[in-house]
């Protein structure tokens, strides 16, 4: 059994997930990272599990509880991206994106929430994106999954508030990770769209490749995960992305969408 806080991070073998897991370990937590990979990160406790497989998720959570006795923190980070025009993106690809980015999170929370509720405490951090309040053209399905994460997070936070379990979502912006290379690209229709698909994706990839160090993002997410109290349901990383999310709140939808078009749609 573990006397330290036990943290679980999905998608914890690379990128933001790995950085978050290492930051939590540095803060003194016992950290389990879950991913589909057979091997994990040195120094962390690895469980090979696919978050879209409910039985595998339940088995992983049961193993952690058997070994430690409790789960205090859950960071739902597992996810990937798709780019392309909506009309040319196959429905099965969009459904797979929702299965991982949204329902994978749901599977983890369904397994962990009863434990935290019974214990009378716990913290859940769901990884969202600035693309939730600022939906990006030619990344519509990714933006939609993250908007769903935000709505779900706010609802779950209020459901669990009386039980001492706090829930929030963190919305990163452009981070320099393997996420960019792993993105599934649907290039079909670029000529019809007069090259706007490729230009939009190239701009996004440039912003990501020159973006924030994942270690800084992981440190921020770790700090949010370890924060006491039910302060905010949604967090953005870095001032410029906080400014974007502020604009999304105060600007008329028509003007906001025009601004997004100028940045990523032309």
Kindly give the residue locations of the regions a language model identified.
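Substrate-binding pocket helix/loop in short-chain dehydrogenase/reductase
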Residues: 85-86, 93-95
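SDR active-site lid
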Residues: 162-231
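Active-site helix of classical SDR
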Residues: 109, 145-148
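Conserved glycine-rich cofactor-binding loop
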Residues: 13-14
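The beta1-alpha1 cofactor-binding region of Rossmann-like NAD(H)/NADP(H)-dependent oxidoreductases
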Residues: 49-59, 91
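Conserved glycine-rich Rossmann-like NAD(P)H-binding loop of the short-chain dehydrogenase/reductase
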Residues: 27-42
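Residue(s) in the substrate-gating loop at a strand-loop-helix junction
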Residues: 129
């Amino acid at each position: 059994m573990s006397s330290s806080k036990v943290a679980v991070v999905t998608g914890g073998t690379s990128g933001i997930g790995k950085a978050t897991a290492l930051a939590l370990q540095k803060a003194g937590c016992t950290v389990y990272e879950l991913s589909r990979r057979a091997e994990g990160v040195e120094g962390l406790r690895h469980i090979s599990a696919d978050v879209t497989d409910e039985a595998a998720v339940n088995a992983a959570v049961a193993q952690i509880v058997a070994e430690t006795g409790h789960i205090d923190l859950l960071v739902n980070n597992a996810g990937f991206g798709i780019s392309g025009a909506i009309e040319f993106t196959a429905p099965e690809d969009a459904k797979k994106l929702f299965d991982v980015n949204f329902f994978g999170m749901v599977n983890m929370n369904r397994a962990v929430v009863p434990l935290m509720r019974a214990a009378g405490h716990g913290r859940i951090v769901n990884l969202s994106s600035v693309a939730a309040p600022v939906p990006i053209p030619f990344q519509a399905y990714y933006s939609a999954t993250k908007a769903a994460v935000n709505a779900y997070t706010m609802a779950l936070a209020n459901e669990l508030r009386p039980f001492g379990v706090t829930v929030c979502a963190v919305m990163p912006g452009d981070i320099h990770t393997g996420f960019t290379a792993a993105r599934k690209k649907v290039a079909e229709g670029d000529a019809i769209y007069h090259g706007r698909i490729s230009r939009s994706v190239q701009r996004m990839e440039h912003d990501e490749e020159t973006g924030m160090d994942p270690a800084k993002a992981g440190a921020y997410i770790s700090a949010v995960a370890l924060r006491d109290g039910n302060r905010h349901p949604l967090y953005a990383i870095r001032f410029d992305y906080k400014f974007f999310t502020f604009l999304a709140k105060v600007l008329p939808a028509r003007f906001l969408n025009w601004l997004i078009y100028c940045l990523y749609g032309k």
